[in-house]
């Protein structure tokens, strides 16, 4: 989801044709050696920002599972902190080395690789899906046995992440020149980040960046103070502004309300309009139409006495219909990108054999039509090929890490056998290449789709009696860890290519950032896990953890346990998701005007299970951006990302002091609740029966 929302938004940046040479502006500046691009100050700033953003990503991951791209936030904050560092030293009479765009790129890479572990590490998906808290929401006795439940452990989490997160880096290194130089893949998010960094280090761009940082800081402070204010009124479940029935009590019971979350207002400002529109459509279809209808069949389609969490009741429809849409969307995009990748590679090979340039359907996406290298391309290619990363070392490192994992991972998750890990590491490089190539074409990472595929295959192969639920989820983590980091690395190579940053320094910064993330993210998760109601509607619902466990249960048990007509609904919405994706793809290829108005099937699926409260927040964010763009398009384009980032960061970082207060048993002093008139009358009658306090 993260890649989906971020990719559609950031791709717009790279569609602009830049006619002025970027590298001519930097021609007089000396290019630092790769070892000089990685400095102590860059690592310190990376660790601080990585921790900061990890809290934000973790909170988003555990609430809705929708995490937008934070590249703009990371870029602005890295530039601001590094400039502040150097300016402070200069005022003290110490003149450090100049802050270059190469060092800026290293910080950006390190920060994003660190904070992305909070997402790809599975804390809101497969790791939490193994836990007893999530398993208790499913009434399958077989899935609650000890063999199918694994409680998170801080030491095991860190060890597992170290084992799986580095392998993907080495699997894709030998193909970096093919991806960046030969195929000239665009990697829209990486290119957008590079253009942002390049602009910071021009005189005009530096001035604009200072204004953006100022706006971001003001937005951050306002968001943080608003979260602090809300905390005082949230003493219990259903208390505070986050439970305010904005549209009335009936709508509130259907999860239609505005919960005053600055985070999701900011997310709504960053995500494309069509994503927010898709969420709203999904909310109306599910909570406005479908669930009330199915609930009216209580006692006929399913037992009326079942608890809310039972998969044999309404919850079963909610979970598995949303899974059907997510899987349908994922499978379509998976096969679409695999076929596009294979066809594009075939045309390139045929074109190379005939020595004639071939026009491909995706030439606009890959940029293969360039025949004469510009000054910028020649300069960037020269730098990119200068500092090599030996292929033999990368291959040896992959084999060594794979061998260690084959021995160690079965000790971390006893449900996985060494042969399962071997098979995963055999096919992972192929999937890593497909995902990295597809991301370069479309800016859409399918790492979660490969993970879901692993859940089905390994879960079904092992079976419920031998721990197939946990084994499938662990295999999902293994596959996602390899595939996700591989595509992230090539994306960063593209950023380095466009900023004349050495690929060797980029690789080292990615390794260092990943190492930081493997320690920081589990510790951040552990604080959330111990201090909050993870998996509960009041707190952090972690919807994708339930969905991933539901997928694992389907893998080991099949469809037999579903309530009446649920399979038919699942099939219908599975086909609907494929039809929507197909229509969107055809409209895009043919240039139909309706392409921008076709909703995202994945976006529609998320509120099917979670509800509509965050959807309203995101639509408010879209409305704010729309009105701002209509009244002042230039300032909106320049400063809206900074305002949105500040809203996200301020509310997100409040989770740190909030968790500390919770661990210290410091609770909010007041509870603000809204009752209907009838309920209020009952409350008043009850209060009159209580003795008057002295």
UniProtKB/Swiss-Prot annotation:
Protein name: Probable metal-nicotianamine transporter YSL8
Protein topology in the membrane: Multi-pass membrane protein
Keywords: Membrane, Transmembrane, Transmembrane helix, Transport
GO CC, any one term: membrane
Pfam families per the UniProt record, alphabetical: OPT
Location of the protein in the cell: Membrane
Family: Belongs to the YSL (TC 2.A.67.2) family.
């Amino acid at each position: 989801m993260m890649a989906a929302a971020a990719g559609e938004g950031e791709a717009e940046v790279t569609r602009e044709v830049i006619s002025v040479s970027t590298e001519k502006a930097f021609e007089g500046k000396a290019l630092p050696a790769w070892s000089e691009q990685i400095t102590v100050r860059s690592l310190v700033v990376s660790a601080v920002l990585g921790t900061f953003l990890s809290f934000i990503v973790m909170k988003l991951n555990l609430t809705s599972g929708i995490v937008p791209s934070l590249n703009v936030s990371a870029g602005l904050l890295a530039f601001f902190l590094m400039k502040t560092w150097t300016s402070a030293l200069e005022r003290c009479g110490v003149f450090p080395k100049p802050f270059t765009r190469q060092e800026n790129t290293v910080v950006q890479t390190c920060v994003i690789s660190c904070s992305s572990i909070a997402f790809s590490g599975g804390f809101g998906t497969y790791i939490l899906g193994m836990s007893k808290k999530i398993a208790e929401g499913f009434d399958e006795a077989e899935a609650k046995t000890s063999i199918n439940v694994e409680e998170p452990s801080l030491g095991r989490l860190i060890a597992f992440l170290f084992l799986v997160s580095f392998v993907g880096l080495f699997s894709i290194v030998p193909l970096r020149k093919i991806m960046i130089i030969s195929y000239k893949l665009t990697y829209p998010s990486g290119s957008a980040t590079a253009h942002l960094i390049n602009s910071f280090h021009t005189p005009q761009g530096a001035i604009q960046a200072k204004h953006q940082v100022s706006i971001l800081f003001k937005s951050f402070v306002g968001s943080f103070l608003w979260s602090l204010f809300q905390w005082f009124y949230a003493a219990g479940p259903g208390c505070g502004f986050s439970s305010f029935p904005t549209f009335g009590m009936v709508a509130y019971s259907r999860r239609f309300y505005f919960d005053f979350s600055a985070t999701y207002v900011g997310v709504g400002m960053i995500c494309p309009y069509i994503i927010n529109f898709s969420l709203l459509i999904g909310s109306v279809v599910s909570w406005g139409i479908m669930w009330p209808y199915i609930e009216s069949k209580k006692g006929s389609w399913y037992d009326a006495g079942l608890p809310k969490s039972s998969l044999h009741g309404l919850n079963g429809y909610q979970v598995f219909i949303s899974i059907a849409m997510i899987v349908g969307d994922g499978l379509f995009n998976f096969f679409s990108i695999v076929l596009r990748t294979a066809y594009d590679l075939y045309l390139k090979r045929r074109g190379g054999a005939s020595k004639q340039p071939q026009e491909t359907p995706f030439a606009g996406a890959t940029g293969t039509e360039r025949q004469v290298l510009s000054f910028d391309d020649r300069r960037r290619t020269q730098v990119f090929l200068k500092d090599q990363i030996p292929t033999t070392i990368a291959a040896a490192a992959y084999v060594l890490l794979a061998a260690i994992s084959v021995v160690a991972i079965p000790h971390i998750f006893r449900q996985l056998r060494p042969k399962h890990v071997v098979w995963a590491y055999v096919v992972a490089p192929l999937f890593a290449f497909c995902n990295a190539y597809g991301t370069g074409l479309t800016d859409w990472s399918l790492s979660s789709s490969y993970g879901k595929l692993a859940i089905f295959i390994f879960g079904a192969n092992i079976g419920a009696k031998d721990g197939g639920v946990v084994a499938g989820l662990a295999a999902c983590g293994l596959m996602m860890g390899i595939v996700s980091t591989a595509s992230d690395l090539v994306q960063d190579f593209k950023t380095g290519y466009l900023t004349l940053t050495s690929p060797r320094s980029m690789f080292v910064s990615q390794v260092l950032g990943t190492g930081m993330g493997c320690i920081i993210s589990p510790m951040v998760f552990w604080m959330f896990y111990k201090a909050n109601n993870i998996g509960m509607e009041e707190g952090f619902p972690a919807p994708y953890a339930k969905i991933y466990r539901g997928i694992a249960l389907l893998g080991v048990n099949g469809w037999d346990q579903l309530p009446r007509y649920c399979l038919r609904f699942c099939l219908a919405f599975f086909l609907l998701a494929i039809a929507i994706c197909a229509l969107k793809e055809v409209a895009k290829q043919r240039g139909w005007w309706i392409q921008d108005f076709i909703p995202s099937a994945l976006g529609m699926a998320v509120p099917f299970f979670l509800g509509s409260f965050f959807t309203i927040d995101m639509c408010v964010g879209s409305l704010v951006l729309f009105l701002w763009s209509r009244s002042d398009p230039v300032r909106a384009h320049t400063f809206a990302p900074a305002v949105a980032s500040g809203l996200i960061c301020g509310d997100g970082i409040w989770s740190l002091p909030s968790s500390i207060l919770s661990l210290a048993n410091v609770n909010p002093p007041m509870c603000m609740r809204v009752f209907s008139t009838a309920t209020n009358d009952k409350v008043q009658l009850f209060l009159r029966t209580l003795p008057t306090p002295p």
